[in-house]
Amino acid sequence: WLMALAYGIFGVSSFSAVFFSGLFGTGIIVLTYRLANHLYKDSWIAFAASLILLFPGIFMDSSRRAMVDIPLAFFVTLALFAFIKAKNHKPWYLLFGLATAGGILSKSVLGIFPLAIAFFHLVFSRQWKEMVNPLLVTGILLALGLGFSWYLISWMQFGQSFIDSHFGVLIFNRGFGENIHPYNFLGYAEDFLRNYWPWLPFALIGLYKFGKRGFIEKDGNSLLLFLWPTLVFMVMSTSKNHTIRYALMIFPALAIIAAKTFYDWLDSRRKDQLISGLAGIVCLTALFVNATPFQAKVTLGESSKEVRQLASIIKLNIPENIKLGNFRLSFWNPKHAILFYSDRDLENPIKETEELLKQLQNNPKKMWLSNSVQFNSLKSKMPEAFYLIQANSKYAFFTSSHNRDFVKYNFSSMKIPNVK
């Protein structure tokens, strides 16, 4: 919905597609600063937490992608910020509910985490009376009523097919089904071991200290910051589909925990040196990855470059409402990029060469996309069967040899590129 709004304001473009992701990413940094400053009344912790959040590059990279993980992380952070603020001013519970609803509307059931974190925080801190606070109950009703309104509307419009596709395929099959990945409870731990440096050891030590303060010393703020990443991490680890960007919602908490851990360890001189060093690293890294050929997660390089190179000729040759064949590519990638840049949809993949040949025989005019290596292998085995329309280092766009005379290369009446 927000992407559609950006399209309406700025026109359809890559900038419009990622506009709100970038805006929400900036909002997360601001919220992290405000939350840390509210909890500890110390600008050093707040500023350090904001800088720590920027690295590793997975956060900045995700903030530049048209995906819902950053909006979800923003609403989770906003909801828990409001929950903490409600300790002294109860009307903040209403914003807690509205932000949770935004999380549910952003990424379905994953948006419920603020409710779960708040519930366990109240239980472990024995705030029984607070659990029935009228404003908190109202906030929860707002979260569930507004958040799940989309489910009701979708069910009323699409019926059982919505239930089957959303809950059956998207959630249960992808998350827990037999055909995704072998079950590995440590999958997210492995992702953090690969991607969360240099902060991982400090965050782990900090989590231990925060857990001790929360459960033994009965410090409410420490308990909440401990439950936030721990609960999300444990629940997400029960699924089979482990992708670190799904856990971006815990990055603000880990950044604050790491910053507070440094604050407790360092004297004033070391603190100033750390901040100066972090700020310098931010500037030098940004300069290095964007002014040199070196490629990294945070590099401001052209996204989906290989798809963009083929998008115009795909659109020229494939009529509207006709799908592009998919030989041995994945189900999702590059499906969305093809749809965005060429206005053409990619079929579900087929894996067997025999099936490809059968479909080409039945429909010689059908056009296909495959990995370039796969196409070269096909071409070497059956050089007379296929005609290569265009290829690059990653993808090959091809058809049958019988269709070569019908391939179009005249772009004179077509807008290029289709999407900037």
Regions found by a protein language model. Give the residues of each.
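Short periplasmic/luminal acceptor-recognition loop of GT-C membrane glycosyltransferases, typified by
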Residues: 287-402
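Transmembrane-helix motifs of polytopic, lipid-linked glycan transferases
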Residues: 19-40, 78
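Signature aromatic-anchored transmembrane alpha helix within multi-pass, membrane-resident enzymes
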Residues: 262-292
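Short acidic/glycine- and proline-prone juxtamembrane loop motifs at membrane-interface regions
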Residues: 18-21, 61-71
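Transmembrane-lumen/periplasm boundary regions of multi-pass, lipid-linked membrane glycan transferases
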Residues: 9, 86, 98, 102, ...
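Membrane-interface transmembrane helices that cradle and orient dolichyl/undecaprenyl
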Residues: 38-39, 43, 79-93, 262
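Transmembrane-helix signature of polytopic, membrane-embedded enzymes
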Residues: 32-55
